[in-house]
């Protein structure tokens, strides 16, 4: 008989406090494994020691290939994706998803595939929308899904974007109580329609996951998963493919980077700002160079050349000022 016994949790901005609160409410005999991704990038993380101190369960950074156990908390280490592979945990230095490594979606996606109805996915506070696609995968494969109430979250974006795929939306205290109720319980048996949906979702998620970890050709996988889009990857400048079969607009490139529309738009916003800053710097340097040339021609008595350079400098100054105003208004 299937029992819910694997909890995958994702958090970002404000996540340390939310995770400590959640860990403090777990019972010491929790009959489930807890796997956590917090967006820490490549930076050193003290999260396992903080969670161990906050509650009764031991927390540690996950190790590649280790067998996971119930009643333990495993945290993704810096700069490594954490995924589930059968009875073991794997650490992968794969392509970033939603500009993050570790990212939440790879953990949730692998949890959906490996655990099916045994899985419980939890999205906590954070910016943008990492975790939404992964929570959709867990729900599609028969798992239970929980989201922190946006009103209770330090950052509302991730909970809001994941809410369409949530079975329960609760503050952290309510999430902990609901998790205790769900763990060890038997998921309801799916009907025929649900079973067919689960099978279709499982095939799509399997294709996506195997391409991401390099078990099959990403080019062939992308042809199965979706269609070419008009966008290019912000990380590698490769072509992005729109992933079909999801209620979210999602994109992947053949090197493994993946984005939801929120993350993609945010990345493009950064690109626009960098481009505008580069253009403003170039215009300011052009102004300085032309003023220097104007002074040189003035000393040579060439007033026509001096006037020409000063006019070019004036136009460059105006253009740089316009860009600066646009940047300040953003």
Language-model regions: role of each:
Residues 1-295, 314-328:
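Conserved acid/base catalytic micro-environments in cytosolic active-site loops
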Residues 300-314:
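Short, charged, amphipathic alpha-helical segments
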